Amino acid sequence: ERESVQKSIEVSEIQKEIVLYEYGKSNKKVLLVHGWSGRGTQLVKIADELLKMGYMTISFDAPAHGKSKGNSSIMIEFIASILEIEKQYGPFEFAVGHSLGGMSVLNAIKQNLQVKKAVIIGSGDIIQDIIDDFICKLQLRPEYGIKLRNHFEAKFGGKMDDYSAYKAAEKTEIPVLVIHDKDDDDVSVKAAYNIQKHLKQSEIMITEGLGHRKILGDETAIQNI
């Protein structure tokens, strides 16, 4: 049943409201998680394919993304949103995450999200590398990267690197499919290989010529999911 229902839910842990999309109707549910500066509807081609296979999909706009309010967000809020959605809509058969959404899915699994398998597409890996790359693109001085890390650790406690994807991968027991494009300019394909190296059960699929976003609509990649 191809019907999309939009709702708002409160994520109590972060005291923010997010917009959520239910697509289809089934007892078998899949959670879809968009990436940085993305929105829930970005994964629509994947949702269409899953619908044909009898799954219902739940996607959402993270705080400050898509139709959700706010002017800033960080991965901790993505993870809190995933865990709140599981409470209200779970259990999910599996989870699919793109880019920062892939990192968030692995971290949510580390924090006890219960899924039978996960798919991560164009996922980032080491947080300090991502920050350093961002600082470089903005042509800021490298010490800003250290300041950002110190600010994060002072505010949230613990080490920032604990949220890196490879660290979450080490704690992940379920099978994970890692999909990444060789020509991804936003996130190097090295991230995929390093994440896979730290997973206990994994498959890797490397595409070519699709970059960071087109991969979400690629038939071959979608068929593998």
Regions found by a protein language model. Name each.
Residues 72-93:
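Alpha/beta-hydrolase active-site loop
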Residues 96-105:
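Gly/Ala-rich beta-loop-alpha elbow adjacent to hydrolase catalytic centers
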Residues 40, 47-69:
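Conserved alpha/beta-hydrolase
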Residues 110-158:
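Hydrolase active-site cap/lid region
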Residues 1-24:
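N-terminal cap/lid segment of alpha/beta-hydrolase-fold proteins
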Residues 165, 174, 188-197:
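Short alpha-helix in the alpha/beta-hydrolase fold that links the catalytic acid
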Residues 171-173, 178-180, 184:
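Short beta-strand/loop motif that positions the catalytic acidic residue
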Residues 210-220:
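Catalytic histidine-centered segment of alpha/beta-hydrolase-like enzymes
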